Amino acid sequence: MPTLLWFWDVRNGNIMEGCGHTEETMVLDEKIITQAIIDRYYEKLKQNLSVDAAIVGGGPSGLVCSYYLARNGFKVTLFERKLSIGGGMWGGGMMFNEIVVQEEGKRILDEFEIRSKLYNNGYYTADSIEAISTLCSKTVKSGVTIFNLISAEDLIIRENRVTGLVLNWTAVEMAHLHVDPLTIQSKFVVDATGHATEVVSILQKKNDIKLFTETGKIVGEKSLWAEAAEKDTMANTREVFPG
């Protein structure tokens, strides 16, 4: 005999009577659920062992970069060490979940269909939750494969060129466990880790190389000056080492 239950009709706002479990209802099998997760993840990982571009860091810059690369036909994989994608944008400014963009940034918001409001001449605001969740969704739908909870702990170097990433679970790194990593090959690697420049820092620390910068090393960051920082970011978002 079926079990009667009441449910809420979201579309019409009515409480309706329906049927619950019947003898014909599929019984969930925990083993199949586990097999599905393992098989699908294995397929996804195996398909991304060799890519055109590997992005390290899933904040807004990494997401937008990977989105445009994928839209232009490149095979792109993004690795984020944390559980959630989006970097610090979720919190807006000091946990006030609003962001401010200029006219150039608004064009990107418009392309992603993220709503914004004019606040002052040249200053637009947007809800940070809408902004970053939309960036995440549209980046995945553009064809980018995202792996969270994975850290890039080293680089593959061949003949003075970066040719891939050395990867491990973030949990392994946090627990200081001695677990050997795995690798992927990539024609290009993008360091989108923000202030820390983690990928370039590894490159500089472990190899006797000279970067394509003023000093040949990581220049580093300075105290806050928004106008200068925006210009420097635009000028210095470029290749700093082959690959």
What are these regions (language model features)?
Residues 70-90:
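Glycine-rich FAD pyrophosphate-binding loop
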Residues 191-207:
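Flavin (primarily FAD) binding-site architecture
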Residues 116-188, 192:
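Feature captures the FAD/FMN-dependent oxidoreductase FAD-binding
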Residues 51-77:
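N-terminal Rossmann-like FAD-binding beta1-loop-alpha1 element of flavoenzymes
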Residues 61, 84, 196:
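Conserved Rossmann-like nucleotide-cofactor binding loop
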Residues 2-52:
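Extreme N-terminal leader/targeting segments of oxidoreductases
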Residues 91-115:
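N-terminal glycine-rich dinucleotide-binding loop that anchors FAD/FMN and/or NAD(P) in oxidoreductases
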Residues 202, 206-243:
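Flavin-dependent oxidoreductases
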